Amino acid sequence: MAKIQITLTRSIIGRPETQRKTVKALGLTKMHSSVEVEDNPAIRGQINKVSHLVTVKEL
């Protein structure tokens, strides 16, 4: 499968707990931190929940 790079571009301060947990589950901890993960439906679902906080780049 393809890999995607996810970057946290907006802060989680003041966001609901569910969004904070989703960002943490994606492996993002600090602003502008990035992770490379396999592209699968589970990851895409998590990205959709916090799409306003992250940017996604296909590798």
From Swiss-Prot:
> One Pfam annotation, family name?
Ribosomal_L30
Gene3D superfamilies per UniProt = Ribosomal protein L30, ferredoxin-like fold domain
| Listed InterPro entries | Ribo_uL30_ferredoxin-like_sf, Ribosomal_uL30_bac-type, Ribosomal_uL30_ferredoxin-like
What's a single GO MF annotation on this record? structural constituent of ribosome
GO BP terms in the entry: translation
Which family does the similarity line name?
Answer: Belongs to the universal ribosomal protein uL30 family.
How does this polypeptide assemble, per the annotation?
Part of the 50S ribosomal subunit.
In terms of NCBIfam families, this protein maps to: rpmD_bact
Q: What is the protein name given in its UniProt record?
A: Large ribosomal subunit protein uL30
Q: What is the lineage of its organism?
A: Bacteria, Bacillati, Bacillota, Bacilli, Bacillales
Q: Gene that codes for this?
A: rpmD
